[in-house]
Amino acid sequence: YQKKDPVADRLPWTQHQTLGIYDAVDYALNAANVPVVTYGGELDPQLLASTTMQKLTGELQVPLQVLIGAGMGHEFDADSRRRFMEFHLEKSLVGRPQSGQRKKLRFSTRTLRYSRCDWLRVEEQLVCYQPATVEGEIDDMDTLRLTTQNAALLRLSREIAGTVVIDGSELELRGAAEGLLPDVWFQRQADGAWTVLGYQESRAISRNPDLRKRPGLQGPIDDAFMGSFLCVRGTGVPLHPAAGGWSERVLQQFREEFAKWFRGEVRVVSDQDLTEQMIAEHHLILFGDPGSNSVLARVLPMLHGQPVEWNAERIRVGQREWSAAEHGLVLIHPNPLNRAKYVVLNSGHTFHERDFRASNAWLFPRLGDAAVLRLSAEAENAESAVQWSGVFDSGWKLSTE
């Protein structure tokens, strides 16, 4: 209903990848796990959202009921409202299945932010921001049979079945890991076969020693603002005056937009006032460059992925380089000072005033996991031109393209 041509108006590659995080069409399969009814007025352009989902779920053999109000615009008619509420009342009286009662599951996600469905959790994807799908059913022999796509690491509640068959690999479930953990971990091997992890292996992998993308620590940049965050402003001398002015404008824009659209106050401290407790409790949003922000200068050489360099001459990300006098760096990464939290450089939300005003359909990530922006003192509302943007893989590394 936004009237965008899927070819002519196609988004830049990075935006197109992360758009799927919030695009409902990529989650149609999940309607198999919960009763769904939707409504649209016959004359409402947004009825297209309902009918599109009905078409997609139909192709997947998933039930989805659509109520259409005859002659109505963007509002209910009395009969449709009654039927809509009766549907929800009936289903709420039944409630969701209790633990262990669900025998069949069909689940898909584009992001580890939304990784759990009942007794299943997708802990890693093979390819980030692409659909990871798990479908399965518990048979009469107490065996859970699963098929997967784009999943690299799974957790299953142990009590649901005695054994599990994942993509043809038959493995112990209820008695796995010596029966000492509530969930059992399963890892995909390079040849596509799956293995079950023992007690010590499970404890180790749950700590994420190799710093993989995991639920709640998977990007993109905007994901950092779904938890407690703290902005850290530099107090030193920037490598270039333009970089200092740019980072201040970005911070000011974030504060103003957050106050207006989220009705909250962005917390800001100086790099000299940052404490260990703050590092432990918050995602850190660092503004400045290695000259002006001592915290940024400290964490930059410690990033886990491909080398990131920022000095007075250049910004280098992997094999790519830009002039530091004319460009600024934006990225998200696990914080080397607290690997359970994010660190973000020079960015608030990557959507802005015009997107808030347009529609909530426009509030999707614009810069992926990392970007280099051209500094521009003339850019309205501190916006800068994107010279490059990209996404990290499951190991927080960039491709070598």
Please name every model-derived segment:
Residues 1-29, 33-34:
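Mobile cap/lid helix-loop segments that gate and shape the active-site cleft of serine hydrolases
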Residues 30, 34, 56-60, 87-95, ...:
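Structured segments of extracytoplasmic/periplasmic soluble domains
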Residues 140, 149-157:
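Extracellular beta-sheet-rich ligand-binding/adhesion modules
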Residues 17, 21-24, 43-50, 77, ...:
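Solvent-exposed, acidic/flexible segments
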Residues 2-7, 48-51, 67, 78-80, ...:
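Short, solvent-exposed loop/turn and secondary-structure capping segments
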Residues 145, 156-401:
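Solvent-exposed alpha-helical segments and adjacent loops
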Residues 39, 43-147:
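C-terminal catalytic histidine-bearing segment of alpha/beta-hydrolase fold enzymes
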Residues 1, 20-21, 32-43, 225, ...:
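Cell-envelope and extracellular/periplasmic
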